[in-house]
Amino acid sequence: MGIAECYEQKMKKSLSALQEGFNTLRTERATAHLLDQITVDYYQQPTALSQVATVSVPEARLIIIQPWDKTLLADIERAILKSKLSLNPSNDGKVIRLVIPPLTQERRKELVRQARALAEQARVAIRNIRREGIEEAKRGHKEGLLSEDALKAAEEAFQKATDASVADVARYLAEKEKDILEG
């Protein structure tokens, strides 16, 4: 794998991280990904909710959490209340139900701001990856490992990958904004 391909993979990882970040933003539609950031103390160890319970979405605005160990119900409930999701869990002794309430216009605007901030972080990360790649190619040129033509080709490849990745960020952001604003 060449230098450009290696850095292109890093750009794709930045895009994946952006999508994971978008998944944690609450919209009016229930998804299991909404709870990805929630951890529960399980034997004094912070453990991902998905590792201690089954999370299902039977309806568009309902999430059901069924822990494998019923003694975790209170801990899961506490973890959800402490999260930034603004959700009120309902514990019936067997499962926890999360009803996703409609978003207020103010909350929608806040979520759009958060989505834009995540997108900007991704763009900055992608540009930094491009800069690192170009610097590595220039070092290779100085050391005689790359010819002048190979250096130019590498710089063009980095720029092309950066442009494509930044366009993907813009597309993902537009989709997420539409999802947030239209519910």
UniProtKB/Swiss-Prot annotation:
Entry-linked InterPro entries: Ribosome_recyc_fac (IPR002661), Ribosome_recyc_fac_dom (IPR023584), RRF_sf (IPR036191)
Record keyword Cytoplasm present: yes
Which UniProt key words apply to this protein?
A: Cytoplasm, Protein biosynthesis
Biological process terms from the Gene Ontology for this record are:
translational termination
Spell out the Pfam families in the cross-references.
Answer: RRF (PF01765)
Concerning Gene3D superfamilies, the annotation shows: 3.30.1360.40, Ribosome-recycling factor (1.10.132.20)
* Lineage top rank: taxon: Bacteria
Q: Which GO terms describe its molecular function?
A: ribosomal large subunit binding
Where located?
Cytoplasm
Q: Name one GO cellular component term.
A: cytoplasm
* Chief subcellular location: cytoplasm
Family to which the UniProt record says this protein belongs: Belongs to the RRF family.
Q: Which PANTHER family match?
A: MITOCHONDRIAL RIBOSOME RECYCLING FACTOR PSEUDO 1 (PTHR20982:SF3), RIBOSOME RECYCLING FACTOR (PTHR20982)
Q: What does this protein do?
A: Responsible for the release of ribosomes from messenger RNA at the termination of protein biosynthesis. May increase the efficiency of translation by recycling ribosomes from one round of translation to another.
Q: What is this protein called?
A: Ribosome-recycling factor
Q: Which organism is it from?
A: Treponema pallidum (strain Nichols)
Q: What is the lineage of its organism?
A: Bacteria, Pseudomonadati, Spirochaetota, Spirochaetia, Spirochaetales
